Design a protein with these regions (language model features):
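A short beta-loop-alpha structural element at the N-terminal edge
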Residues: 2-16
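Active-site rim helix/loop that mediates acceptor-substrate recognition in acyltransferases
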Residues: 21, 32-54, 60, 115
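Conserved GNAT-fold acetyl-CoA-binding loop/helix
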Residues: 23-42, 79-93, 97
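Conserved beta-strand in the GNAT
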Residues: 56, 62-71
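Conserved catalytic-core motifs of GNAT/GCN5-like acyltransferases
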Residues: 74, 164-166, 179-199
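Conserved acyl-donor/pantetheine-binding loop and adjacent beta-alpha core of acyl/acetyltransferases
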Residues: 74-131
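Conserved active-site alpha-helix within GNAT-family acetyltransferase domains
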Residues: 125, 130, 141, 145-146, ...
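Conserved GNAT acetyl-CoA-binding A-motif
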Residues: 126-128, 155-168
Length: 204
């Protein structure tokens, strides 16, 4: 396997990795009628705005993981709201009716109009953030640590004072992994059984 900088030709493959890890780290293909719904929320803006902070993991079968970074989270989310979402709002219908009956893709389409990915002022001391996903065949082999280390080196070179990330409260494996990488819990958001834990660490 090889860690290399993201290239524009990797766009579709990174979206596919997001889909194959979109159920708290497990494959979510069976859950979604729109295979791009997850990537539109969690991947595309990073590739568009800060491709220099994106790396992919590749083996003989193709791209099997990625790590994405944003140097200044406040600025990133401002651009996310101002530049990324409006074109998607033009090409997707806002879900209506009983929210409890929406399928997973509809729930994500709703986030195009009522975004949850917004700047968290409580994380101001850790201004950068990252997002990493590896599909099953790439997990448990140490590649996740290497990819995060690569991105952290970039953030340190750019004088970042700290970095944070969000992880599902249901993803115990990922939480343990991030703790081993030096991340500590800062805050929680949403319901206890299906919310987000924000973890952070200082740099360097």
């Amino acid at each position: 396997m090889l860690i290399r900088p993201y290239q524009p030709s990797d766009w579709d493959a990174t979206y596919q990795v997001c889909l194959e890890t979109g159920d708290s780290g497990l494959d979510a293909k069976h859950l979604h009628t729109d295979p791009k719904a997850l990537g539109n929320i969690y991947v595309g803006a990073y590739l568009r705005f800060e491709p220099e902070l994106a790396y992919v993991l590749e083996d003989e079968q193709g791209v099997c993981g990625y790590v994405l970074g944003a140097l200044d989270s406040k600025r990133f989310y401002e651009r996310y709201l101002r530049e990324w979402l409006p074109p998607l709002q033009q090409t997707h219908a806002k879900p209506t009716g009983d929210r409890s009956k929406w399928n997973p893709s509809a729930q994500l389409h709703a986030l195009l109009f009522e975004p949850e990915m917004v700047y968290q002022p409580k994380l101001v001391n850790w201004p950068a953030h990252l997002h990493i996903d590896l599909i099953a065949r790439a997990q448990g082999k140490g590649w996740g640590k290497q990819m995060i280390d690569r991105l952290l080196a970039d953030l340190i070179e750019r004088k970042s004072s700290g970095v944070h990330l969000g992880v599902s409260t249901r993803n115990d494996r990922a939480i343990g992994f991030y703790q081993k990488m030096g991340f500590a819990e800062i805050m929680r958001d949403g319901p206890a059984d299906d919310g987000t834990i924000y973890m952070a660490r200082g740099l360097p």
